[in-house]
Amino acid sequence: MDPKAFVSGMAALGAGIAALACIGAGIGTGNATGKAVEGVSRQPEASGKIMSTLVIGSAFSEATAIYGLIIALFLIFKI
């Protein structure tokens, strides 16, 4: 087996695994948004506090997806 082909194949496999971080971020953001909507429907007067907490939590959740995407791009383009 050609070592260069092996390294390229493993880089593609690693990029695919790193891209799976987007799945977790999507699930987390979806759950958080659903709970925020439930909270606002129960206590409309607390909607400002709930939404600000949701935005901060979503930013942290999406940061994981961005890190996974960056690692995948690094592996694909061998930076």
Curated annotation (Swiss-Prot):
It comes from Clostridium botulinum (strain Hall / ATCC 3502 / NCTC 13319 / Type A). GO terms for cellular component: plasma membrane; proton-transporting ATP synthase complex; proton-transporting two-sector ATPase complex, proton-transporting domain. This is ATP synthase subunit c. It holds the Pfam family ATP-synt_C. Keywords: ATP synthesis, Cell membrane, CF(0), Hydrogen ion transport, Ion transport, Lipid-binding, Membrane, Transmembrane, Transmembrane helix, Transport. F-type ATPases have 2 components, F(1) - the catalytic core - and F(0) - the membrane proton channel. F(1) has five subunits: alpha(3), beta(3), gamma(1), delta(1), epsilon(1). F(0) has three main subunits: a(1), b(2) and c(10-14). The alpha and beta chains form an alternating ring which encloses part of the gamma chain. F(1) is attached to F(0) by a central stalk formed by the gamma and epsilon chains, while a peripheral stalk is formed by the delta and b chains. GO terms for biological process: proton motive force-driven ATP synthesis. InterPro entries: ATP_synth_csu_bac/chlpt, ATP_synth_F0_csu, ATP_synth_F0_csu_DDCD_BS, ATP_synth_F0_csu_sf, ATPase_proteolipid_c-like_dom, F/V-ATP_Csub_sf. The keyword DNA repair does not apply. F(1)F(0) ATP synthase produces ATP from ADP in the presence of a proton or sodium gradient. F-type ATPases consist of two structural domains, F(1) containing the extramembraneous catalytic core and F(0) containing the membrane proton channel, linked together by a central stalk and a peripheral stalk. During catalysis, ATP synthesis in the catalytic domain of F(1) is coupled via a rotary mechanism of the central stalk subunits to proton translocation. Key component of the F(0) channel; it plays a direct role in translocation across the membrane. A homomeric c-ring of between 10-14 subunits forms the central stalk rotor element with the F(1) delta and epsilon subunits. One of its GO terms (molecular function) is proton-transporting ATP synthase activity, rotational mechanism. Belongs to the ATPase C chain family. It is a multi-pass membrane protein. Its main location: membrane. The gene is atpE. It is found in: Cell membrane. The keyword Cell membrane applies. The chain crosses the membrane at residues 7-27, 56-76. The record marks E62 as: Reversibly protonated during proton transport. It comes from the Bacteria.
